[in-house]
Amino acid sequence: MSAQEIIRSIEAEQLKSNLPDIYVGDTVKVGVKIKEGEKYRVQPYEGVVIAKRNGGINETITVRKVFQGVGVERVFLLHSPRIDSIKVLRRGKVRRAKLYYLRDRVGKATRIKQRFDRPL
């Protein structure tokens, strides 16, 4: 057994199996575990998926939202223990793999058409 096969087998055990299908353009709500003192609480983060990187255990999504007039982007490792839940709220109809152009847009120009052919 080579070193790569050993690493893949260990990573396969760590993968989460209960993740929904997430596509670029979707509006998602990510529940992030935050530690305050000794307690953990779940903080929701809602926004549009503007980028997705596959790669086994290193799979990430970049979620963008506008908070108090300022664009905020966060990168989430999908298989991280800090991610409590991911819920798809709305499917978006886009024709790009990366939606970085949304960074330059303001207001109604950032809206994405809804897609109805994929289930939530």
From Swiss-Prot:
Keywords: Ribonucleoprotein, Ribosomal protein. The keyword Ribonucleoprotein applies. GO terms for biological process: translation. PROSITE patterns: RIBOSOMAL_L19. It holds the Pfam family Ribosomal_L19. One of its GO terms (molecular function) is structural constituent of ribosome. One of its GO terms (cellular component) is cytosolic large ribosomal subunit. Belongs to the bacterial ribosomal protein bL19 family. This protein is located at the 30S-50S ribosomal subunit interface and may play a role in the structure and function of the aminoacyl-tRNA binding site. This is Large ribosomal subunit protein bL19. The gene is rplS.
